[in-house]
Amino acid sequence: MGAYTYVSELWRKKQSDVMRFLQRVRCWEYRQLPSIVRVTRPTRPDKARRLGYKAKQGYVVYRVRVKRGGRKRPVPKGIVYGKPTNQGVTQLKFQRTKRSVAEERAGRKLGGLRVLNSYWINEDSTYKYFEVILVDQAHAAIRNDPRINWICNPVHKHRELRGLTSAGKKYRGLRGRGHLHNKAPPSRRANWKRNQTLSLPRYR
């Protein structure tokens, strides 16, 4: 077995004494640093490589801190409108994953880079930490690499904001295949619109 097999096995056994200690120490360090910070190399090299990372020019990794918990509805001055059944503020569930939020924040802060993928690295009672892999689409090493230069196409600008990354497709419900998943694509909204539209074809 290769080295990455052992590394991934370490990360599978997160409750071992060594990993518990390591994760607690790392979490303390992450809390002292800004919410978005660049890291010199991935914390989980096996996971990063599986998701497309290469240790070459043009690839960068950023660690992003996201607050845990539900999403509170923004109601200015506490004014809610509509019927009482729809006036909830606090018990609402955000429809997107924390990982997709981390990708969005990294993509907004680093507008000149393209978000490739992301993965979980740590969490405590208050925050979750993710590492986001970004690609510099203007770098010659990226533009000349046939395995990654697809991301240089302008249609991939801010793919993280449009639910086109792996995390985005997951919260959109596009992971499944087959007859049990024919309501999810192309989107939940499109499916709702199709079902609500009355079609009256003219007979000739």
UniProtKB/Swiss-Prot annotation:
Residues 172-182 have a biased composition (Basic residues). Residues 172-204 are annotated as: Disordered. Signal peptide: none annotated. GO terms for molecular function: mRNA binding; structural constituent of ribosome. SUPFAM superfamilies: Ribosomal proteins S24e, L23 and L15e. Keywords: Ribonucleoprotein, Ribosomal protein. The keyword Ribosomal protein applies. GO terms for cellular component: cytosolic large ribosomal subunit. Residues 193-204 have a biased composition (Polar residues). Pfam families: Ribosomal_L15e. InterPro entries: Rbsml_eL15_core_dom_sf (IPR024794), Ribosomal_eL15 (IPR000439), Ribosomal_eL15_CS (IPR020925), Ribosomal_uL23/eL15/eS24_sf (IPR012678). GO terms for biological process: cytoplasmic translation. PANTHER family: LARGE RIBOSOMAL SUBUNIT PROTEIN EL15 (PTHR11847:SF4), RIBOSOMAL PROTEIN L15 (PTHR11847). Belongs to the eukaryotic ribosomal protein eL15 family. This is Large ribosomal subunit protein eL15.
